[in-house]
Amino acid sequence: MARYLGPKLKLSRREGTDLFLKSGVRAIDTKCKIGQAPGQHGARKPRLSDYGVQLREKQKVRRIYGVLERQFRNYYKEAARLKGNTGENLLALLEGRLDNVVYRMGFGATRAEARQLVSHKAIMVNGRVVNIASYQVSPNDVVSIREKAKKQSRVKAALELAEQREKPTWLEVDAGKMEGTYKRKPERSDLSADINEHLIVELYSK
């Protein structure tokens, strides 16, 4: 399955919530009719069955993190194998992706931009270049921008945007050095309440 390359706001309208696919700190519901379905007239969304609600939640989370269907299912299987709450394990695995950590640290304005930085070999983990977006960052790992990439205007612009966002408590970032430490895995209370991971567990448990 190919990665979606179409209009980002269209996806957010389809899911009925901001998927944080666009750069900036202003919520996109001020830019577009987030409550309406995509299309010229924004037809009213049909009432969904329980399965439909579960499927929409899975699609929403998958799109937030920019993960393809097969990858997402594999994350769920891994989360189910781990000790603890499967839904919380799933979110922790998604948050631990290198592209997401780069975004959370403020080096990329969006997860897509952070993924591009990783694939272009602009990111190091513990002093070594890693160009795999799905690489799982471990507690106490140091993530940094390569020296030759520090002058990129998009990195500087992303850091300026990050100053306006709430800083994740599980990360420690030195914007001047363009590096940060993944102190710990985020707890459920650290993450968005707009995500209902229980619906995803119910979907895959069938």
From Swiss-Prot:
GO BP annotations listed: ribosomal small subunit biogenesis; translation
Taxonomic placement: Bacteria, Pseudomonadati, Pseudomonadota, Gammaproteobacteria, Enterobacterales
Record-given protein name: Small ribosomal subunit protein uS4
Organism superkingdom: Bacteria
Subunit structure: Part of the 30S ribosomal subunit. Contacts protein S5. The interaction surface between S4 and S5 is involved in control of translational fidelity.
InterPro entries per the UniProt record, alphabetical: Ribosomal_uS4 (IPR022801), Ribosomal_uS4_bac-type (IPR005709), Ribosomal_uS4_CS (IPR018079), Ribosomal_uS4_N (IPR001912), S4_RNA-bd (IPR002942), S4_RNA-bd_sf (IPR036986)
Originating organism: Salmonella typhi
Gene3D superfamilies from the UniProt entry: Ribosomal Protein S4 Delta 41, Chain A, domain 1, RNA-binding S4 domain
The gene coding this protein: rpsD
Ranges where the S4 RNA-binding domain occurs: 96-156
Coiled coil segments of this chain: none
Bilayer-spanning residue ranges: none
Pfam families: Ribosomal_S4 (PF00163), S4 (PF01479)
GO cellular component, one term: small ribosomal subunit
Keywords: Ribonucleoprotein, Ribosomal protein, RNA-binding, rRNA-binding
Functional description taken from the UniProt entry: One of the primary rRNA binding proteins, it binds directly to 16S rRNA where it nucleates assembly of the body of the 30S subunit. With S5 and S12 plays an important role in translational accuracy.
Family designation: Belongs to the universal ribosomal protein uS4 family.
GO MF entries: rRNA binding; structural constituent of ribosome
